[in-house]
Amino acid sequence: MKKILFFAVALMSFVAIGCEKDYSPSPTTRADFQQAYPDAVDVEWEREHGHIVAEFKLPGVSNDCEAWFKKDGTWVLTTYDIKVSELPEAVLNAFQSEYGAATPIDGVEYIEKSNGDKQYVIEFETFEASGEIDVFLSYSPDGKLLNQWVNIYYDYIYDLL
């Protein structure tokens, strides 16, 4: 029984290390965030895989945003969940020419990076003999395919950091 309890506690510790909710960032990081996003509401801070993440809403822009910072507080990127109708025409055309207009899109994110790059990530599902697969495609605003990730367990955000 003690072994089971030990392994349960150890497993929960590993999960807690991966994503620490209710994190309080440094005053400098918090001030930089507030200056960049003065209209942000419902801000929650956490640590995720060594990064500081602010989850927030921007009224009139997106109800699901994340600003990612390095450990030292340097801003890396911000993601905004957006509607398919907000995709640039070039991005939607590139997606539909490759996958068809009838392919349902599960989600779209607009991403701004600290180096000035902007991109859109489209998520959709496809079915193969092995089962259902989540596909993530990253496009530049002019519709160029930048990257793709295929796996239900893979989080593309770590490649962007």
Residue ranges and their predicted role:
Residues 7:
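Short, flexible loop motifs at catalytic/binding sites
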Residues 11-12:
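Repetitive helical segments and hydrophobic/amphipathic motifs
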Residues 26-161:
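First exposed extracellular module after export/assembly in secreted or surface-exposed proteins
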